[in-house]
Amino acid sequence: MATKRSSSHSKGSWLFLAKELPKLDWRVVNRKTEKPFKIVLLGSPDEQEQLMTMLFSFPHYSAQFFKDLLPQLPSFDRTHSEPYLIHLSDLTELADVINQTKDSLFILTMNSNLLVHTSQIPVFNWQEMPEAKTIHKMLDQFSGHAFALSFVFPLFRRSMIEREIKQTAMQNTTWVVSTSLPNLIPGPHQIFTAPFEAASDFVVLTINEFKLMMALTGLLGQKVQPLKLWMQASVVLAMAKTAQVSATQIISKVPAGGGLIVKGAVSYAFTRAMGEAIVLTWITGRVQSLSFFKNRLQAFMAEGKAIAGRLIKPR
């Protein structure tokens, strides 16, 4: 009987998911990546070339295992970036550029002798602070164009990818914890079955993963075109189903009072692992294995438990 109920429940989840997915507006990501902007590369021709090389560098995504999986990073075509760049060797033409440019604008330099302080536009000196801090500062100060920056220039992709995945993971964890709290009135003998039991959990989390998939597509410099996302969509669907099974295998059954933390932890780990799998699928052109997903799911469980615990018992 339990198997029959489980099968019926799973079928209902997938039917509801199929109904909800067409409602996702993929054009939202494209609008974010198409926001116009200009970067002024200020310096000598050699300095401008160094800045260009920097903009088209692609820092490894995160942990060492990514470096092992990506021994050779992809090369990038610079030609499409020219409409976004203004090359200046000195300050004489800067005022005209500021007055004539209608798009959002900021200055990037590595020559302290050419530093200009203006309240009109942000100025970033690449040699002023460590690379990672400069990238984060630029993205924070130019936040309305962060998606567009990542779409055009590989330099910003690692930071934006990490931000988007972590933000989605936090949203999912918060949602799972907050919707489960009213039901947390167990008897001393009661036990919780593993996460993703409710159709709403599975459907909402999977829809959020599709949103994340579309966001990561844009951040990796690709236009979101639903008919071309079949590979990534297969990753999301296959691993969402695997997450349902893995959740039970990882957690089995937990005593009353501990289920909610574990439930939140799995939703967090599920999103982090899914995000990594989508990124690697895009970069390598190969769908990541389910064993990869399970290993990454396990790797993020401890972090997920800590976050879920803080959400349940805020200090």
Regions of interest found by a model, annotated:
Residues M1-T179, G218-Q222, K228, A269-R315:
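Terminal, membrane-proximal amphipathic helices
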